[in-house]
Amino acid sequence: MKNLIIVESPAKARTIGTFLGKKYKVVASKGHIRDLPKSSFGIKVEEDGTFVPKYSIPREVNPTVKELRKLAKEAETIYIATDEDREGEAIGYHIAMAIKKEPESLPRIVFHEITKTAIENALENPRKLDMDAVNAQQARRLLDRIVGYKLSPLLASKIQKGLSAGRVQSSSLKIVVDREREIKVFKPEEYWTIEGLFEKNIESSIFAFNGKKIDKMSIKDEKMATEIVHSAKVESFVVESLEKKERKSKTPPPFMTSTLQQSASTQLGFSPKKTMMVAQKLYEGVKTNKGNMGVITYMRTDSLNLSEEAVGDARDYILDTFGSEYLPKTLKKYSSKSKGAQEAHEAIRPTMIGFTPIVAKDYLTGDEFKLYRLIYNRFLACQMNEARLESQTMLFKGQRSTFKANGRKLLFDGFYRVTGYSENDKLLPELKKGQQVTLDDIKPQQHFTEPPARYNEASLIKKLESLGIGRPSTYAPTITILQTRKYITIDKKRIHPTEIAFTVIKLLEEHFSEIVDSSFTSNMEADLDKINEGRLDWQKLLADFYEPFMQKIIDGKKSIKSQKMAIPTGEMCPKCGHELLRRKGRFGEFIACSNFPKCKYTTDLDGNPPPEPEKTDIKCDKCGEFMVIKDSKRGKFLACSAYPKCKNAQPLVPPRELDIPCPKCGSKILEKEGKRGTFYGCANYPKCRFISNGEPLKRKCPECESMVVHKVLKTGEFYECIDKKCKWKERVPNDKLKNP
C-alpha cells in the first residue's frame, strides 16, 4: 500500500504530489478538521482545576475525515506534513486524533519551501509531533475562547447586541482608539519657516539668528519671522563653511510577515489580508519554467534567518549579474528584533534564484508577480553591498543670520541597483570658504503643527509587532475582525474607530483593564512562547488567568451599569403610534421607534428624519426604473429606486474626461473616486481594465516612450513611467506640485 502524506490545503497537496512517485499519496485535510464547538463553551474545568477542551469534528468536514480514515487504514506509513508553526503543529495533532492514531507515533515532516529537494530531504529526516508547540496553540485557543465566550455576552448585555471582545482584538482596538483620542485633544501650535535662495539657485533655510540656533519651533509668530526677513535682506553673506561627508545606506533585511505586509501596503497598495492570500499561493505552488512548485518560503514567520545554500545562490547571482563591487566580502546575517521571534524558521525568500522577475512575469498573475518581485528584490538586496552617498552642507553667514544649504550625491548605488533609488542628486556648486554670496530671495512661511496621523494597516501592524501583540499569523485577521465587527472603518487608507469602539474600550479600561493592556497581552504572548519551549505548563497559564478573569465577569454582571441607549423619549411614533426611544448605534445616537423591526421610523436627535432620496428623470440602465439621488460618506450618488432588487449605482457628477487616450485601447480615460481615493480608469471598462492611481500626462517616458503619470506619495510627488518594467521616475518641480 502507498505511503500517505497529509497536508492542509489541496493546492499544497497537488504541488507535493508532482514531486513524488507512485509510492506516495498526498491528500489535504482542507484546514482545521477538529475544533472547539461553535454552539457551546467547549471547555470543561475539572474539580482539580484541569482544563479539558471538548473538541468536535464539524459536520461539514465529516466526508473529509471519513476519507482520511479510510486511506489511513490502507497506508503503510502516515506522514503529517502540515505547516511548520504552532497552528500547523496543532492541525497535525488534530488530524492524528481524527483518524484515531496516536499523535506522537506518526512521523512528522517539515519544510520551509515546497520544492522537490525540500520535500525529499524532509522525508529522509522525519521527527515526532512537537507536543510543546501543540500545547502552546491549545493554550492560545482556549484563552481566546474564554475571553470571547465570556466577555462578549457581557458587552452585548451592557452596551449593544452583536459586540465582541478578544485577547488580541481588544488590545489592538485600544491602540486605534487611543490615537483618535490624541487627535481629538490636539491643539495646533503656530510656527514659521524661512527659506532663502542664494545665487546660483542654491536653496537654503534659516539655521541661526543672533547667535542662537533655529529649530523647527523656534520662530513662533509672524513678528519674529518678519524681523529675521527684514534683517537678512540688508545683510551681506559669505560662505562660512563647506562640508562633505560620506555615509552609507544600510542594506534592508529580508522580509518577515510583518515587514512584507507593511511594504506590500505602502508600495503595492495591498491590504494585509490580500498580501497573505497572494503569498500563500506563491508558497503552495504556481506554474514555473520548471513545473509546478512553491516559489517562496513559508510566509508566516518572524525570523530573519536565511539558509546558507540560499545565500550562496544569491551571492553567485549577484557576482555574475552585477559584478564583484556589489558583493560583500562575507555573507550578511540578520536577527529579528521581534519579541518571541522563532529563529529556527527562515525569512521569506524566493526558492529559486534563477526564477527571476523577468522569467516569472510569463508565469505569474499580475498580483502574484508584483508580490514575488518585491520578495525577490528584497532578498537579493539583503546580500548586496551598502549604497554610498555624499551629503553636502554649506553655511552662509551674515551679520545676524546664518542660512544652511544641503546637497546629496549618490556615489555608489549598491543594493539600490535592485530596489531602485527614487531621490535625484541635489548638488551644491563649488564655492570657496569666505566667498561673498548674494541672497536673491527670501520667503517666510506660516505653519501649524499637525496631530498624530491615524494608523493605516501597515503602521498598525508595525505598532502591534513593536508591542509584541499577536504573532505573524494574527496581524491580518485582527484587522479584518475589527472591520467585520464595525469597530473600525478604513477611509482613504486610514483607520478610524467607530463610536461604539470608544464605548467598548472605555468599559474594558474600567472593568477589564488587562484585556486592553498591551503589556499584559505581550506578556501573555511571551508565556505562550515559554510553553512552546517547554518552560511553562499550559494548564498553569490557563488557571492563573481563568479564576481572576471569571470573578471580574461575575462582578461585572452586577456592578456595570447598562449603557444601552434605549431611553424612552415620552413621544409617540408618527407612523405607528408606539413610543420613540433614544438609541445608540455604531455611528452615534439617534431616535427610533420601539416597534422595530415592524416599524423602521428613525430621526436624528433634532427630530430630522433621514432625507428622502431626491427623484430624477434618469432611467436605470439595468432595470429601467428611475434613479434617485442618495447620500453617503463620500458624497451624493445616483442609485436605482428599485433597490434592493436592483443595486445599480453611479456617480452623480459624470467623471472628468482626460484629453489623453487609454494606452491599452485608445478609449477615453476617466477620473474616478473609489474607496482609496482618486484613480484613473478606461471608459471602456470592463472590456479594457487599464487603471492608474497617478494622473496620466501627455508627456512620454524619456527612456521607453511609455505614458507618464503624476503620483502623490507620502515621500513626495513624482513623475513616473507607467510601464512596470521601466524604473524611470523623477521628482515633480515645486511649481507643478498638487499639494505644495
What are these regions (language model features)?
Residues M276-Q280, I479-T480:
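Short, hydrophobic-biased segments on the C-terminal half of alpha helices
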Residues M1-L142, K150, I219, K223:
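Intrinsically disordered, low-complexity regulatory segments
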Residues Y283-T297, R485-R494:
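A short, conserved structural fragment
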Residues I114, A118-F198:
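C-terminal or mid-to-C-terminal helical accessory/interaction module adjacent to the motor/catalytic core
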Residues R14-K38, S170-S218, A381-K426, A592-S594:
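Structured, non-catalytic alpha/beta "coupling" segments that mediate domain-domain communication
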Residues K213-P253, Q435:
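Metal- or metallocofactor-binding catalytic centers and their adjacent structured scaffolds
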Residues L242, T251-A264, K290-Y298, P451-K463:
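Short acidic, hydrophobic short linear motifs in intrinsically disordered regions
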Residues K2-N3, Y24, A98, S152, ...:
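Basic, low-complexity terminal or inter-domain segments flanking catalytic cores
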